[in-house]
Each structure stands twice: as C-alpha cells, then as structure tokens.
Amino acid sequence: MSMSHLYGTDGEDGVEMENFEVSDWDLQNEFNPHRHRHRQTKEEATYGVWAERDSDEERPSFGGKRSRDYSAPVNFISAGLKKSAAEDVSDEDSDEDEKPVKQEEIPKEFVPKKLKTGGNFKPSQKGFVGGTKSFMDFGSWERHTKGIGQKLLQKMGYVPGRGLGKNAQGIINPIEAKQRKGKGAVGAYGSERTSQSLQDFPVVDSEEEAEEEFQKELSQWRKDPNGGKKKPKYSYKTVEELKAKGRINKQLSTPQKELSQVKVIDMTGREQKVYYSYSQISHKHNIPDDNPQQLLGKDSKPQGFALPELEHNLQLLIDITEQEIIQSDRQLQYERDMVVNLTHEIQKMSEILSHEETAISNLSKVLDMVEECERRMQPSCENPLTLDECAKIFETLQDKYYEEYRMSDRVDLAVAIVYPLMKDYFKNWDPLKDCTYGTEIIAKWKSLLENDQLLSHGGQDLSTDAFHRLMWEIWMPYVRNIVAQWQPRNCGSMVDFLDSWVHIIPVWILDNILDQLIFPKLQKEVENWNPLTDTVPIHSWIHPWLPLMQARLEPLYSPIRNKLANALQKWHPSDSSAKLILQPWKDVFTPGSWEAFMVKNIVPKLGMCLNELIINPHQQHMDAFYWVIDWEGMISVSSLVGLLEKHFFPKWLQVLCSWLSNSPNYEEITKWYLGWKSMFSDQVLAHPSIKDKFNEALDIMNRAVSSSVGGYMQPGARENIAYLTHTERRKDFQYEAMQERREAENMAQRGIGMAASSVPMNFKDLIQTKAEEHNIVFMPVIGKRHEGKQLYTFGRIVIYIDRGVVFVQGEKTWVPTSLQSLIDMAK
C-alpha cells in the first residue's frame, strides 16, 4: 500500500497534509487483529507534519521496529494507477454528483483481487489473506456410511426433494454461504446475500439501506483537498408535483372577496405605507435590514456576486409561476367538472324537452276534441252530440290522455258539455214507473267523472267532484219531485227505485234522500195511522224500508207500540187478528222492548182467559186453552209457564184429586193425564216448573192407588199407574240426556270454529258475539263519529268503543259501562 493513500499533499505549497478520510485499506483491515498500527516516533511527536519520513515507495512493515526484508518476493496490489492531484479533484467532484455504486454493480475486472500470501505477511495473516476453505464438500463423509440420518427423517415423514415441516414449508436446498471478496468488515463490499436468500426472502435488507445512507453522508463531510467549488445542485419541480401540492393545499393565494378592499397600514419599514388590500402586501419587495453587515471572519469568504433583490424577484417569479400552474390546474379541473355537469344537464333538459313536446302534442289533441264537442253542442249543428258519444270521448281522454285528463278541470268540462246532455236525457223520466232508467249510463259516467282521491279521503266537495255535482244538480231534482208526490203506503215502487240506484249514487246523497225525504213522509204517515180502522197493516209499508234505513226507523217504533197498546185495551184472546198484526214486529223490536210490550198488553189478557177455563173430564171445552197456547211463540216461555202455574195447574190438580177420590177408572185417568200432557210443546214440558206439576200429578195417582187397601181396586190399576210413572220418568231422563248431548256438540263445534280462526278476537268482536247470542242488533252508524271514534247502535243504545271501554250516550255526556250492563240496558 503506497503512502499516497495515507497522506495527501497540497498542490500549491507542496506541504504534506494528512488526509483524514476513510480509505479502502482502512475498511479492508477494520477487523484484522494483526493490522499495523503506526506508532508515533519521537521525531514525529516533535516536528509533527514536518517530520522526515521514508520514501513513498517504501512499504511500511507490520512489525514494531522490524526492518524491511528485501529478500522476500515482491507482491503487487491492484490499486489502479495513481493520478495527479488535479485529476483526483476532478474525479472527486464528478463522484460527488454521481450516486454511490454498489459492489455488485462494479465489473469483475475492476474489483481488487485477493492479496497473495508471502512477502512481509506473518504466518497468522496468511490464512486471513487467503480466505477460508470452500464448504462444498462438507458432509461428504456420509456417502460412505449407513445414512442413519436420512433414514430417521424418512421414518418421520420426510419426503426427499421437499421441504421440512408439516406442510413442507421448509427450504429445499441448504443455506448457501457467500465468500467475502476481501478482508473488509461485513458489508464492506456491498450486499452479501446469495441468490437463494433473495429468492426465499425477497425483502429489502435494512443493512443495504443503511449502507447507502452511510455512503451518502460520508461523501458530504469529505474535505476537498484542492478547495475547489462543488457543482451547484438544482432541484426541479415537475408540473405533476405542483398539481399535487395544489390539491393538498386548498387555500388559494388570491385574497377573499371580503378582504380585497381592506385598508392596511404598513409600518414595518422606515416610512409608513398604506395598502388597500392584503394582496398588495404579498407583492411588496423585501427591505434590507438597517443593521450594518457583520464583519467577515477569517475563515469566511466574501461573496463575490450577491444580489438579494434579484434573488427575491426570481423567487417571487417562481412562486407566482407555481401559483399560476396550480390555479390553471384547478381551473382546468373545474372546467372538466363543468363539462360533465353540463352534459348531464343537457341530457336532463333533453328528456324534459321531449316530455314537454309530448305533453304539448297531447294537450293539442285534447283541445281539438273539446272544441269538436263544443261545435257539436251548438243548436245549429247538423250532427248534434249525444250522451253515448260524449261518454266515448271522455273514455278516450281517460285511456289515451290520462295525465292530461287527470290534471284538467273535469268539473268545468263536465258542466259545459255533460250537464246539458244529461238534462235532456232525463227530462221525461218518471222514477217510480221506470226505476232502472239511466242506471247504465250513470254508472259509466261515475267511472269517468268521480274523483278517486276525494272518494278515498271521504270528501264531499261539489266544487271538486264532477260526478257528485252532476247527481246533485241534475239527478236529485227529479227525485225530490217524485218523493213529494209519493204515498208512503205504496212503498214498493220507491223501495225498488232506491234499490236500483243505491250502488250508483254517492253515499251522502242516499243519506240525504232517506233522512230528509223518506223518513219525514213515513213519520207523518205513522202519526196518521189507526190500527183499529186501517185495513192495511202497518208492517206492510214500514218493513220494506228496513234493509235501506235500518236504525233510522227506531224513532217510529215507540209511537207504533203506543198505538198498538191502545188498540189492545179492549182486545180478547179469541180475536186472532192481534197476533197477525203483532207477529211481524217480534224480530223488529228489541227483545227487551218486545217482552215488556207482551207482559203489559198480552199476558194479562191470557191470564183472564185461563181463569175462565173450566176443566171437566167428562165434557171438556178446549177453546180458551187453545187461545192461550197459540201465543206460545209470541210470549217468552217463562211468561207462559208463569200463566200456567198461576191459572191452570191449581184447577187441574184439584180436578184430578176429586176424580181419584170417587172410585175412578184408572184407565180413563191415565188417558186424561196423557191427553193434557200432549197439549204442551216439548219446550214447555222441559221447563222444571212444568215437570214438577206433572210429577206431582203422578205422585197423587200413586198415592191414590196405594191407599186403596181392603177396598175394591180395579184389576191392573196399580201396575198401570206404576208403569206410567216409570215411563214418564224415563222420558224425562232421555230428554235431559239428549239436551246435554246437544249442548256438548254445540260446544265442540264452537271450540273447533274458534281454533280454526287464527285471527285474535278484539273487544269489538266480543261485543258482536254477545249481541248475536242475545239477538241484539249491533251495527255502525253510517257517517257518525264522536271525537274520531265510530258510533255503533247496540239495540236502541248508541255507543262507541275507545281502548277497550264501552261508552254509552247519556243525557248530556258519554258514560263508560260494562258489557253486562250494556246487554241489560239493550234488553
């Protein structure tokens, strides 16, 4: 190694100066324990760099005071040709501009060769210089042995040619070793990774990055021996970098609008300056400091060419150019977005334009059709418009031009065209003679003119529904005229007329007809009715209105009952006409009111009739008994049983006892007993009180037979009476068993029906069920509500349901009540 690698010389003065940079020799011998360490001699300590040294051509020895051995062979080190100082300086300058080159990138012919052993090297150094022995033949001794390792691996599942591990994730080839090129430390010659390492672990080694960073920093603190100037380094910014910077920094350099007209006083300089916007401050020149320039030190070099104003202006131009590029990029992006938005707007406007053109075309066609109708509506037209043709035109408008027809004012159009034709169509119409006249044409116009939206919301505004207005202004006057001339007792024609139109006319018009026209006529006729003189029964002209009016007829029932009660004051049960008059009202009146009417007006008359009945076994007159029994279906079973217990059975048992006390014929008594029992229905006989009376008669007969001991007894009388008693008791038992079986079957069917219905029963359904069980009419009142709740009629009582509670209408307020109390009040 030449001394020029350890010491440098000044090109100008020729003074030797020690170069402190790290050389290749230092790196190669970093970890060499036998490296020569220069010991400073006394002369070097005294004179320093001016001490005399051996010739540069002489090679320093590795021993302390060992002299040079000239008998040893000469060893040459491939270190290249020595260049002059100027060439070294130029090379170093050029090297500083270039990036450090890795060891792998240097061609093999330029790499320093290994140092050969011999010469002045010690024996301990020869092994280090020569390198280590190759490991290629390591483990070759196993080829001459039994191969126990390979067999053990195969027993544990190892497959030759595959990696170790459960999933064969191990490496197949053994780890390769790479021999270092020189004597330097680890990493001194670049990366030492093998091709196998790069293949198995392709991650970039952090040591390589650290080496590159070290080389870069090392080149920065090296001192230029000639003091030459380094080449200036320029940093360039591309347009893409400026665009990216502009996208990150969204703050524009231009001032905001509210700050563009702000007056600013600048007092940072020697003089006061006034600016009228913040943007002017950003464009002002930098003012040099007033302080005197600092004196240059010994080591500092004066600037030969320094122009701060020019540098500032250049920097300002650069900044302005950058801002212009950023603003241009933003403007370009804005324009591109604007193009996209305008494209979408054009498409949208094109769709709107086509839609508007279609709408204009459709409106033009609709206008032509309307004008054609107006032309044909003129009196002088040869081909006048008919109602059927007008309906076809409206059907065309509804089918082909539905949107235009829906948006148009159908009320005005119908008033102008349809109403005159409809008046002409019904001008000769008599509703009572031809009740179905015009139903088909009106049903067709209902589908054309009725406003479905108002219908779904329950609206009744005549100004917005053409069909309702048509029926009210054109159809309703004919109905008013005919009802004014109508006689309530001739109800058939009027009922048929309303039945034909009930599904066509609006609900509120039907309510108006029934409440304002029909009901007053019926009420007046009921007031004039006299059941004693009128030959036509009242139910014949009241009951036909029940399907249409239902609960509306409730106010008529009370005066009818009063008139019937007055007519029954002088009635005798022998007159069967009373039953014919009252029987149709049984299902119309509520069960409670009907029972009260019967108990007050009929039952006393029947009791008087039974009191007049004479029971004579030898000559029996049954007319009075038949008159009473004939009312069995009209009065309740309990009322009839009460009459029999009070007015019939005491006399009947008394006659039986008298007959048994006079040596009777038991055969005749048996026939007499069975004959009277056959006069009663099964429902009456099943009553416990009636059973007790007939059983009492059997007991009297048995006692009479048993008490005749020693006297004359009719042969077989005792057996006959016993057989009769047994037979009657068995019939009673069978009847009771049959009743129990029927009740069980009804309960089973009811349970099956309730199980089949998966819909849970609410409180309204419970009330409906109870009403059906007690034969009480339960129905909603049409068009009547209280605080948004639907009103119902439960018999004669008006109720409403709110959160599972029944409220009954009182005199002034609504009173909550229980379900059982409600049923009792309805009865």
Swiss-Prot record:
Q: Which GO terms describe its cellular component?
A: catalytic step 2 spliceosome; chromosome, telomeric region; extracellular matrix; nuclear speck; nucleolus; spliceosomal complex; U2-type post-mRNA release spliceosomal complex
Keyword Nucleotide-binding recorded: no
Where does the source fall among the domains of life?
Answer: Eukaryota
Segments of skewed composition (Acidic residues):
88-98
> Where is this chain's protein located in or outside the cell?
Nucleus
Any one GO MF annotation of this record: nucleic acid binding
Q: Which Pfam families match?
A: G-patch (PF01585), GCFC (PF07842), TIP_N (PF12457)
Matching entries from InterPro entries are given as: G_patch_dom, GCFC_dom, STIP/TFIP11_N, TFP11, TFP11/STIP/Ntr1
Where is there biased composition of kind Basic and acidic residues?
A: 41-60, 99-112
Renumbered residue ranges of the record's region Disordered: 31-129, 179-203
Concerning PANTHER family, the annotation shows: TUFTELIN-INTERACTING PROTEIN 11 (PTHR23329:SF1), TUFTELIN-INTERACTING PROTEIN 11-RELATED (PTHR23329)
The record's similarity note reads: Belongs to the TFP11/STIP family.
The protein's name in its UniProt record = Tuftelin-interacting protein 11
Gene transcribed to yield this protein: TFIP11
